[in-house]
Amino acid sequence: MSSESKGIPIPRSDSNKTSDVSSWEEDYELISLGSSQDALQRSGIRSAHGDSGYASSPLRMEHLSSSTIIINNQLKKIDVNESIPENSTLHNKYELGAVESSTSSLSLLQSKEEDDSSNWETEDSESAVEEAELPTIFEGKTVISPSSSGTDHSEAVEYTVPTAPPIPDLRFQQSYLQSIQRANGSAFLVALITLRDHVLYPFLSGGMWVFVRHIFQFLKLQEKGFHFGQSLRRNLGLFSTFKD
């Protein structure tokens, strides 16, 4: 029986050694149930070579029914219904931690957005209440003016307050000229306005004062009960034609 059939390691050249090292780049190897002894021998050969660059990595399993597996130079048997060994779940734990951190960050963002929206809603409700409390005397328009910093804006309401009509100019010259302007160049209206302002109104005002004078002159004031007339006669000497 040759030394190779007995499973005894044979020293090889450097080229063969590099090919053996490249053949053992996989960290874990799946082996059938009938070849468990060969798997143990191969693990011993691997430890004999003393590969310093050997490092562990997560287990990769696809479509297994019932087989043996080498994990860190130890032969183990697994079934389909059996869970993956604990050493192979490290990568999944890291993934779960990343997922949990992402979900926690998303929940924080959502809670912050909800707080911001609630703050906006409370501010809108407060402004609506303040606007409802203000007495709306006149209709106005809203004017938004930028602030000095350029970031905030101040909002103000301008109300259009109705103003009283101007006091008319009661001077004769102004009233007469305005009346002439309203005549629109009509000769008949201009003559009528002139006759009214220069003849009729002076006659009425002068006649009124003359009528008042004649009332005081021809009014017969007697001593009986007319104390006002007596005081006028004594103090002012009015109505001297009347005798006591």
Swiss-Prot record:
Location of region: Disordered: 1-24, 105-131
Biological processes, Gene Ontology terms: mitophagy
Induction per the UniProt record: Increases during nitrogen starvation (at protein level). Repressed in nutrient-replete conditions in a TORC1-dependent manner (at protein level).
Bilayer topology annotation: Single-pass type IV membrane protein
CC terms in the record's Gene Ontology section: mitochondrial outer membrane; mitochondrion
Phenotype on disruption: Abnormal mitophagy during nitrogen starvation. Decreases vegetative cell population growth.
Cytoplasmic side stretches: 1-198
Region described as Involved in MIM complex binding. Required for normal vegetative cell population growth but is dispensable for mitophagy: spans on this chain: 165-184
A GO MF term: mitochondrion autophagosome adaptor activity
Membrane-spanning intervals of the chain: 199-215
Keyword vocabulary terms for this entry: Autophagy, Membrane, Mitochondrion, Mitochondrion outer membrane, Transmembrane, Transmembrane helix
Biological function: Mitophagy receptor that tethers atg8 to the mitochondrial outer membrane to promote selective autophagy.
Complexes and interactors: Interacts (via N-terminal atg8 interacting motif) with atg8; the interaction is direct. Interacts with the mitochondrial outer import machinery (MIM) complex subunits mim1 and mim2.
Descriptive protein name: Mitophagy receptor atg43
UniProt organism field: Schizosaccharomyces pombe (strain 972 / ATCC 24843)
Lineage, uppermost ranks: Eukaryota, Fungi, Dikarya, Ascomycota, Taphrinomycotina
